[in-house]
């Protein structure tokens, strides 16, 4: 992940402005796809010319290819905000590091094991480790596991641990209203996606989890001496009971299907804690950046959800990462995790196309990257479309047009 001192950053902004202006002028003066397309204009098939026509002079980057062979490119090297295509990169980084059946545990722990009479002397701590899907049902399962472990009396309180993740709630490039409107506080111990019953983002999910577990334990006949709370757990605790999340591949699918920002930042902190020692938004971004760097992509990444307007990726780089995924053991798992036409964030789009792709939307920025099926010859082909600087709804119409052209008309170039 790149960082700049102020003089260097100012110089870079000036240089980028000049480069952008040159790109815009060049785009008007000559066919933009000529910069990256593997097929010369004179021999381009009709489907490629149709894509170029659909784009027009708008600032849209397109990269299409299969198995390491680039078929079509249009400004594929230009950096743009990937929006929620960042979650696609996070998904790749997670699947590269962990096995798809990995689970994330949530423990109930205390300073000592319960005695022969089932007494826990002191507090019972709920220890979260980054499962974004804890809710009342899962807390109920934890309560029964505590009972089955022989606990009958808790002399202290049930307390939700506020560690081990750092409680940061900001990334460079976020708008000031994002924490209130788009991303709840990402914590290690979550509860109901860290919102209250009205959907308002809260700052004490650990307390709500502790209250819920206290109520469930009492319902199960376990006495609890004091009211629930939240705080930083002491060291040296002994696990008494635990629950585990669904497999990682299921967590990724739930995140990508509806493009859940909260899930992305929690899983990003989980990955960041493993790779950099502390669960922060910045370290989650650094972990994704490490993955993309290792595969030759010089992206700029500040979060895991893609909310940051300062993030930069390019269509050609995403295409190459999709090629890498195709050759990885986890490639089919990633493809299956992405929305199909008419499902998730594609619920009103591309119902007539066989597609698996990740969407992305910010104000004046849009993205769609993944796999589309070739109806003429069969087989999946990878693609990435990024746009910026104009209305995202217009951009999505262009995306859909391009995908349909590829699906129904494209064949491998000669």
Model-derived features: positions:
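Secretory targeting and sorting signals
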Residues: 2-35
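Short, well-structured active-site flanking segments
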Residues: 96-112, 221-230, 331-335
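A conserved catalytic-loop motif detector
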Residues: 125, 141-144, 161-212, 218-220, ...
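Active-site-adjacent, His/Asp/Glu-enriched structural segments that form or flank metal-binding
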Residues: 104-165, 179-180, 190-191
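Beta-lactamase-like hydrolase cores
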Residues: 22-25, 32-81, 100-101, 105, ...
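A small/polar active-site loop signature that marks catalytic segments
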Residues: 195-333
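Active-site SXXK
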Residues: 82-101, 158, 189, 212-217, ...
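Small-residue-rich helix-loop
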Residues: 71-73, 272-414
